[in-house]
Swiss-Prot record:
Residues 152-184, 345-414 are annotated as: Disordered. Interacts with FEM1B. Widely expressed with highest levels in testis. Glycans are attached at N179, N224, N362, N430, N673, N732. Residues 6-150 form the PHTF domain. It is a multi-pass membrane protein. This is Protein PHTF1. InterPro entries: PHTF1/2 (IPR039775), PHTF1/2_N (IPR021980). It holds the Pfam family PHTF1-2_N. It comes from the Eukaryota. Residues 364-375 have a biased composition (Basic and acidic residues). Residues 170-181, 347-363 have a biased composition (Low complexity). It comes from Mus musculus.
Amino acid sequence: MASNERDAISWYQKKIGAYDQQIWEKSIEQTQIKGFKNKPKKMGHIKPDLIDVDLIRGSTFAKAKPEIPWTSLTRKGLVRVVFFPLFSSWWIQVTSLRIFVWLLLLYLMQVTAVVLYLLMPIVSASEVLGPLCLMLLMGTVHCQIVSTQITRPSGNNGNRRRRKLRKTVNGDGSRDNGNNSPDKVRAVETLESASSVGGFWGTLFGNRIKRVKLVSNKGTETDNDSGCFHPILKKRQGRPEIRMWQAREKAKVSDGEKCRREAYRRLGNGISDDLSSEEDGEARTQMILLRRSVEGASSDNGYEVKNRRSILSRHLNSQVKKTTRWCHIVRDSDSLAESEFESAVFSQGSRSGMSGGSRSLNLSRRDSESTRHDSETEDMLWDDLLHGPECRSSVTSDSEGAHVNTIHSGTKRDPKEDVFQQNHLFWLQNSSPASERVSAIIWEGNECKKMDMSVLEISGIIMSRVNAYEQGVGYQMLGNAVTVGLALFPFLYRLFREKSFDQLKSISAEEVLTLFCGAPPVTPVVILSIINFIERLCLTWMFFFMMCVAERTYKQRFLFAKLFSHITSARKARKYEIPHFRLKKVENIKIWLSLRSYLKRRGPQRSVDVVVSSVFLLTLSIAFICCAQVLQGHKTFLNDAYNWEFLIWETALLLFLLRLASLGSETNKKYSNVSILLTEQINLYLKMEKKPNKKEQLTLVNNVLKLSTKLLKELDTPFRLYGLTMNPLIYNITRVVILSAVSGVISDLLGFNIRLWKIKS
């Protein structure tokens, strides 16, 4: 229905727009209809030394986002909570078995409490409805948090980000080994979460370990030594380039042929510098063909296949040395660092193009190439941090048709969208900031040493300092105290309302039980009261636990910003044991901006924002209810127990929101501290005075600093708590309603009119 309305609107829009057109507009439309397919084109590439505004804004380091609207997520969350046992597999997938059992017990107790209350409506309704509302709220919040995993294809494991591909690949009669029999290969990839990762690489690249296994038809299982098996290459198993890899594994060809078939062309970086001028034309053709294979071109004829095979056979030797260097890194890494290197290096199959058995290559150039190893490894690790997981998870096999049979365990994605993400990954690889280094100063005791460091290395040191910081437990204790108080509140309210201090000294156990139940202590009422107490205790603790997680995340963001602001200060950098460098070169400014954007995007983002948004909306809702109750009758407002409970909730939530608002504001100030750039400009002028011969170069850097200052002022916005700010309409409506209600309450209490918000006409 909605699509028909949109079509009708578009039709009528074009219809009435035709009456406004002149000859020039009609001719332009005809030109646009013809398109640009017939225009001459030539090869181009992205300038790797330039930056985009996305890098300054931070959108270069994209985070996972749900593809389902928030209304659908809210509806699904409510359904999954109401019919909790029916979605047991989903809850186990997104939590764990133990947590699911615990939640199932709470769900069954809540259902029992509702049934008992409907049979005997003796106790207060707020004691039953309070835990029920908390359960619905937290279930909806959790559904929105894990929504990025819901939209992606996943198996039984909730943490798995890749598809399980079951492929049937037919042999090619024109292959060199002459193997014409059909061949089936099943590739199963699993992701495991490491329990604890320490050190620089652990804090920088997360807790992911990748293992790849190849299972043949005979039931034997062979481990891929190097594991360089990219999902895009798996997707193209049926193509001649990938069949070469299968031929080597099964026919056991000679070592010389293995070396020739080990490496594939690297995509996204243009033509290798090692190629001679006579081979440039063929190398370009090879790059175009391989890129087409990655982007999903599935209409290759036999002639094109032959051309690909011949071109590959001519130039594979020139890539053996590069493959050797990558395999070197994998072999020489240690323990957990090795697995982290493998996870990052193997994920770059579309760029490095290594084949599965490349560990058998000659590794004789190890010492002379060690410096280049580090820089190339950082390039790939940086690219993996940018959009690697998203692009890997978006691989589909819609274009393979007869070659590949894929088991889709999730929703289908548009192949054009996948191609766009893959091309976007190539752009990021070409403009990787990790390839550039800055001469930084580090302190080892009382000694000051210089060291060339990249963005990854500097950020890794900063994150290790933040992880070593001892977090406070003040807000955890506050949450626990509020949890116990809210769980015991109905009993304490009845106790102090019906008994005086003198009567409390001689109170009996039967009277305590009666006050605890709020009714004569018969068996169903006692069971209902115990269930309500357990529900209130557990669910309230879970809610404040989520708030403590949000507070911890905001604290870590503040520490990231604090240490980042100390990088250009020699005294502060030495105090906190972080690298120090000055913005005396244009390259240093570029790295400083890249580091700033990278640190701003590190850690949980959307998931924590969902929690804060929900808390913000809950606080505003409670405030609106309290204002309405006061307007209805401020003299009898405190006579009801649920109004007291609302006030306790509002006070606790406001304390947490005040903490989050202060941390967020301080974090924003640290990142938007223009005084750092102004100080560096003063340092440049001081340097000009001492070195007049470098005045032109220093003036250039000074101009770049001025532009950076203007750009940061243009892009940075004041900090706002997530919630209503995400929807301007709801934000404005709520601001008017809440402030108008508060104005009415204050005016009623004080006796004269006070207008906190004026609606402008």
